[in-house]
Amino acid sequence: VHHILSGVIAEGQTQKGMQNWGGGVGGYTVGMESTVAPKGIGSWIPSGGEFAYQMHYTPFGKEAVSAEQIGLYFYKDGEKPELIMREMPLVDQFITIPANDPAHKEIAYFNFPKDAILHTAVVHAHYRGTYSKLEILDPSGKRETILNVPFYDFNWQRMYEFAKPIDIKAGSKVIATYVYDNSKRNPANPDPNKEIVWGDQSFEEMFYTSLRYRWKDETVEKQPNYAQPLNKPPPTAMPADHPPH
């Protein structure tokens, strides 16, 4: 299994290949542990609808049976979380990694339209990914590194939970940086002589950061729709020599 994505959709709306859902209920990638929300916070699952799961398998030349299991943990009767955990991917599907480049850099970002609190981050690349960094650039110009993964390993992709959840001011940029080694010095590289672009299979590449956060002014009883301004425009790719400022 390469990865599993999940979501909640309206009944009968499931489509092959879809990955944009109204809410997430956890996921999996190689080396990742279970997803647990802090006390008083939960994933919002409206009544009706369906769970949707995107199952990504990498072919390895043999017939096999999928053996994944999914467990959902609910609050006890009479208990109700007041706050809602949201999920948002920062994705750049326009990456191009030159052949034989030992340290190719890609940068992308998006703007948070409202005040938020960031709880976790997952960085995801394939065999050529070697390094990843996540930064916050607030409206005053202050820039802070909140996650640094100096030795990315495809076989150990962790969900990084911040010891202290991070305040994100409205208008802040969340900036992701990835470095790829597409040279022969990378022992996991399937083909250093090939230019690499975005692709689902492990011998291709990805630039994918998953963030779990909550809106500061959102509660179960008060749910403003911030998804639309967050998704439009989509995350913006930037040339590595012209980072956002």
Features from the language model and the residues they span:
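Beta-strand-centric surfaces of beta-sandwich/beta-rich domains
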Residues: V1-I117, V123-H245
